[in-house]
Every structure is written in C-alpha cells, then in structure tokens.
C-alpha cells in the first residue's frame, strides 16, 4: 500500500512540475507528449526513443515520445533517433 501511495505522489509531483502543454504552449526544441501526463518534452537526440513527425493523436499531441531534433530521423526498426544519412553534405 505504501508503494502505491508513493507512486501516486510521484505522478502528482511530476504533473505539477512538468510544463503543461496544449495549443502552442511548448517552446522551441520541445513537443507536447500525452503519457504519462500531458507535458512538454524535449525533442529526441541520437539513440532516444522517438515518434515520427506527424504521428500525433487527434488532439495534436504525441502519445509517448517526441520526434527527433533537426538532422536526425526516427528509425522505425527500433524507434530511436539516428543520424539522417539521406542529407547531402
């Protein structure tokens, strides 16, 4: 029972301290993520878990993870950010 109470406390604290997001509230370099609570999350860097751009819910938020930073792509084989090898340099 104590573990459950601690878990609830942590979730409430996380939702209190996380920047709540909605229409255009998240700043540059972030996206709005719905899980575990609706909050702004940083865009993915190399090897972070990611969602592809445009894979949002009906509310326009990303379900679990943000897309990758500019210059990276979300590899659908393992859902992580990788260097975009299609860029011409």
Curated annotation (Swiss-Prot):
Tissue: Expressed by the venom gland.
Main location: secreted
Pro-piece positions: 87-89
InterPro entries on file: Atracotoxin
Keywords, alphabetical: Disulfide bond, Secreted, Signal
Record's subcellular location: Secreted
Annotated signal peptide: 1-18
One Pfam family from the record: MIT_LIKE_ACTX
Designated name of the protein: U1-hexatoxin-Iw1e
């Amino acid at each position: 029972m104590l573990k459950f109470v601690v878990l609830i406390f942590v979730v409430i604290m996380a939702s209190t301290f996380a920047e709540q997001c909605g229409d255009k509230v998240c700043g540059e370099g972030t996206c709005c993520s719905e899980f575990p609570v609706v909050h702004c999350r940083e865009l993915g860097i190399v090897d972070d878990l990611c969602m592809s751009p445009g894979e949002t819910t009906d509310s326009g938020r990303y379900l679990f993870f943000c897309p990758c930073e500019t210059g990276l792509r979300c590899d659908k084989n393992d859902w992580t950010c990788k260097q975009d090898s299609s860029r011409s340099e």
